[in-house]
């Protein structure tokens, strides 16, 4: 795997993500993910870009892949739950959001979305 290419793709994707060009960010980040699908930082950034560009099914897939590899990643669980909520799947979202809130009880936003999923389910 060409490491320089992977790094350049990731950096370009992050620049676009930070600039708020979420849809454009998915292009280099997806290419980077294809080069190194095990790299959590790439999958997280790609999931964020998909979520922010309202591509919720694609975001769900990225965050689900992260949770499969790291079941105690509170941020990935939170984002998975948020994606599932956006897809109209509050029952599925409840578990991920409850786990995220349990792992990080200090995160008020996690508790708010957990409670929303419970109420909607």
Give the predicted meaning of each segment.
Residues 1-8:
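TPR-adjacent "capping" and linker segments in tetratricopeptide-repeat scaffold/adaptor proteins
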Residues 61-86:
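Mid-chain, well-packed structural core segment of small domains
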Residues 82-109, 115:
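TPR/TPR-like (Sel1-like) alpha-helical repeat modules
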């Amino acid at each position: 795997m060409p490491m320089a290419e992977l790094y350049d793709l990731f950096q370009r994707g992050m620049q676009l993500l930070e600039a708020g060009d979420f849809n454009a960010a998915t292009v280099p980040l997806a290419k980077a993910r294809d080069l190194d699908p095990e790299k959590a930082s790439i999958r997280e950034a790609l999931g964020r870009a998909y979520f922010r560009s309202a591509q919720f099914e694609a975001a769900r897939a990225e965050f689900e892949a992260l949770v499969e590899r790291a079941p105690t990643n509170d941020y990935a669980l939170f984002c998975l739950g948020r994606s599932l909520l956006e897809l109209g799947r509050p029952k599925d979202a409840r578990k991920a959001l409850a786990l995220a809130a349990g792992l990080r009880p200090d995160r008020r936003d996690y508790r708010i979305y957990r409670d929303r999923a419970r109420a909607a389910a």
